[in-house]
């Protein structure tokens, strides 16, 4: 049985499911577009708070527009078994996610992995600039389509997951996310754009090694490692890397995965810039910075809430700095050789000693996130709320606090020219004193000319509108139109040719075709009267005059009488031409009287059209010269101008002699 949502989206087979939702292949019946519909699980939809957050975040995700972000076209709610279930209508992507690709095909080379992660970081940067933190960046949320394009999914949905007070925390969605959870999220602190950078680093780690950076028997065990432990450098799992190539991939991955947000790439765009270098096997900025600064011994921070102090940590060996020729480029599509086992060294022994100490004093795995939140951190400064301030005031305030300020500009439909749109990192983020804060300043509205889409199909109009940087309002009106075919645009608001802001919404009115009219019954009427009955309704008569016994001009038949047809439809009408008469009975009339009888019946042919055939012998002298046969027979239809065939009797004596 076909299931249609909102009288528009026809659901097909289920194409995926997760901890909190199920995804169906679907068709947008209005414009014939292939889409995917994600529906929240019914047990989670019972939580009103979660449902509201899901709806709000879906709307936020729908505001994003980037080629590497799976587009959200529509949202709504549908009744399922008496429960109002939210759904999201998304772009349908044909391909595989990175989780399945790595599981089935093995890890990527560092340059290949970097090539994949570049558009991921660009997508994240676009999202962050729109004020949306993904919060659930992981391989399962990154698709590679059938043409090799990269698509990031589920923008904004994870915020609903983090903010929920429902039993959602027990679902597989959280368990799967723990492997890519930033330390600040594990501590229960707010996430910002750098939390997504950390998760992107975890994904990059898995792409080049074939395994996540941390694994454990429970989500808590994994989260604890994100907070307290350093990951094994990814180069330890990659064969055939030169020292320089190993340093390069390690620097990019571990910079993204720095424990403190201030030590990471501060924006996804910064990470993308280093990935560009890594994809070309060029030395990344992170690797260059590592080589240029003096090595510092690693230390392990022991939680402060233990009742008995653990043994002092054993310092790990400082990372070596080497200079060697750059690694030869790896062919696109190739995969590295089998990974070798990591060399753990004294750092691994130190971590093991701490874990054993925790086990001895009975703490085991029963820590809480509150415990993790007490880990020590470096001195930080909070970014003040300067959004909406003039540029000079904002710069002075940040410099007063000791931050380095970088300025960028972009158009904004909502923020006046010269005012701060946002900061990166976000307002309220805690970063190290002296760190760089990027201010995005409004350059005012960016305007575009509204294209004329009247007369186009809805699919064509959608492409024109989106190509102009505008958004199609999903509330599409429908009206009858005698001038525009069904499915084409009748009106648009705002009108074509005007100017509006990029991202503005365009509302369309689409034709459902002409209005319906009821065809009147006109059979038996004179056409001179019936014609106005047809044409006054906007119907078009198609007239055929036919031979008929009915009076000339009388309607014999009309198509569609009593039914409803679209205005402008053709009605076929048959009208009598009055050319038929009933043939009179000419039996035993002479030719003159026969002609008179024909004329009286309405026959208009010349006298010569009364054709005499072979005579009929008769022994009755009285029938001599009279008609004994006629064609057509009496009472049969006869065209007024048609030939009439007759045969006359002729007296013949032989007819009196009986045959022997």
Curated annotation (Swiss-Prot):
Region ranges (Disordered): 288-319
Domain Protein kinase: 9-278
GO molecular function (one): ATP binding
Reaction(s) catalysed (UniProt annotation): L-seryl-[protein] + ATP = O-phospho-L-seryl-[protein] + ADP + H(+); L-threonyl-[protein] + ATP = O-phospho-L-threonyl-[protein] + ADP + H(+)
Entry's family note: Belongs to the protein kinase superfamily. Ser/Thr protein kinase family.
Keywords for this protein: ATP-binding, Kinase, Nucleotide-binding, Repeat, Serine/threonine-protein kinase, Transferase
Active site: 136 (proton acceptor)
Annotated CDD domains: PASTA_pknB, STKc_PknB_like
EC class (word): transferase
Record's keyword annotation contains Transferase: yes
Ligand binding (ATP): 15-23, 38
EC code(s) of this entry: 2.7.11.1
PANTHER family recorded: MITOGEN-ACTIVATED PROTEIN KINASE KINASE KINASE 20-RELATED, SERINE_THREONINE-PROTEIN KINASE NEKL-3
Protein's name according to its UniProt entry: Probable serine/threonine-protein kinase CE0033
Gene3D superfamilies cross-referenced by the UniProt entry: 3.30.10.20, Phosphorylase Kinase, domain 1 (3.30.200.20), Transferase(Phosphotransferase) domain 1 (1.10.510.10)
Pfam families: PASTA, Pkinase
Annotated ranges, domain PASTA: 377-443, 444-512, 513-577
